[in-house]
Amino acid sequence: MGPTASGKTALAIALVEQHNCEIISVDSALIYRGMDVGSAKPNAEELGKAPHRLIDIRDPAESYSAADFRTDALQAIEEILAKGKTPLLVGGTMMYFKALLEGLSPLPAADDEIRKQIQIEADTYGWNHLHDELKQIDPVSAERIHPNDPQRLSRAIEVYRISGKSLTELTKIKSEPLPYDVVQFAISPKDRKQLHLSIEERFKLMLNQGFVEEVRSLRERSELHIDLPSMRCVGYRQCWQYLNGDYDYDTMVEKAVVATRQLAKRQLTWLRGWPELNWLESGSDSNLTTVLRHCR
């Protein structure tokens, strides 16, 4: 695991070439078909060397939750173990890792009618008004959910209206944790400036590889819109807005790079509090040897 642009995929492929393991992707963008360039999806050559499970398993118009991931990942783990191989989970979607390792809380399924009502209230009174409501029913969640985060804010209120219990109450109840021994590694540059540089260079490479054209093709599909989870992936949202005419090309690039840096910061915040984690430095020649030592 590790922040975006830290070298996870390259190390994982090197591990597959040296050890009897099989990769399971832990990435909420790689699950979507047709979102290849902007998600830094492994290319055909890389997939030929090291096939990845749980990529290209959903259309961008479809939803996919942490619960869906846990179900799919557990099945993939069992299948890989049955072949006498080691499952190698690789990615940066920390909520997926957490769901797999710790289990999930029994949260109610989404209710379209309640969501529509919440959206109407937001359009009428504003998200700050709904955030004030959340402070009354779930102050702990209100403390960590920003008023400018409508997806999470709406979900917290929706959970309470469906169940009569706060998100904080329900998340204290967990299902069974992962029934396997796990060795965990995080890879990241020691220097934050180096990570920021890698992020900027990778986004410029994506642009040269046809990222704008990829998003333009997605926009042509009538069932896709900017508020879908798939289109909220970093880079895609900013490019979609650029194609809408919301701002110029240079501003799009700047906003996408900033959004990706913010994602990396959130990922690192998760990882700094992660238990039983072995840290690797991006680009270090000893990374492969270090991981293989734990595999034998």
Curated annotation (Swiss-Prot):
Substrate binds at T4, A5, S6, G7, K8, T9. It is an enzyme of class 2 (transferase). GO terms for molecular function: ATP binding; tRNA dimethylallyltransferase activity. The record marks T93, R115 as: Interaction with substrate tRNA. SUPFAM superfamilies: P-loop containing nucleoside triphosphate hydrolases. Keywords: ATP-binding, Magnesium, Nucleotide-binding, Transferase, tRNA processing. GO terms for biological process: tRNA modification. Its cofactor is Mg(2+). Coiled coil: none annotated. It catalyses: adenosine(37) in tRNA + dimethylallyl diphosphate = N(6)-dimethylallyladenosine(37) in tRNA + diphosphate. Its EC number is 2.5.1.75. Residues 27-30, 151-155, 232-237 are annotated as: Interaction with substrate tRNA. ATP binds at G2, P3, T4, A5, S6, G7, K8, T9. Monomer. Belongs to the IPP transferase family. Catalyzes the transfer of a dimethylallyl group onto the adenine at position 37 in tRNAs that read codons beginning with uridine, leading to the formation of N6-(dimethylallyl)adenosine (i(6)A). This is tRNA dimethylallyltransferase.
